[in-house]
Amino acid sequence: MKYELILEQLKIMGFEPILVDDELYKFAYKDMTLLLRNDNDNERFLSISIPFFYEFTGENKMTCYETVNTVNLLVRYVKLTIHDEHVSAVFEHRLSDNEDLEELLESMIHALSTSLSVFLKKMEGEKIPYLDYNPEEDDDETDD
């Protein structure tokens, strides 16, 4: 599938992809900058990422690694990766012939946004209801 179709679909969806270099486009969603990688060697490979969205320190290094692992287990298709002291998110997909690009791109962007949100909330110590549910804390019995 030609990347011109993907770029056109992003424009139809209201995004404004900007060419960064020969194989890279950037576009904005909410407060995020997303990158679309054009793999000239493989037209069927689609990759959208949120690069270097979090920088961690030695103090929170283990928490960061644990949170990356948790999000990777929780959100399908998105991979959080660590490069040096930065966390990035990527969604990679192999395109088929009759792909519904609007549905696919919406799913990819939503999954990336969700991963980022869950990661940041967990790093700030917030509880995620569906993730941090503890049945022992859900005691309906009251002492009268």
Task: Enumerate the language-model features and the residues they cover.
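Charge-rich, low-complexity N-terminal segments
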Residues: 1-35
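Ampiphathic alpha-helical segments that act as solvent-exposed interaction surfaces
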Residues: 65-75, 101-127
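Short, internal acidic amphipathic alpha-helical interface segments
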Residues: 51-90, 144
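Hydrophobic residues embedded in beta-strands of well-ordered beta-sheets
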Residues: 24-25, 43-46, 87
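Long, continuous compositionally biased terminal/linker segments
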Residues: 30-60
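A mid-sequence interfacial segment
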Residues: 79-115
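Short, highly charged C-terminal tails/helix-capping segments
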Residues: 124-144
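Short beta-strand micro-motifs enriched in acidic
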Residues: 18-20, 37-41, 83
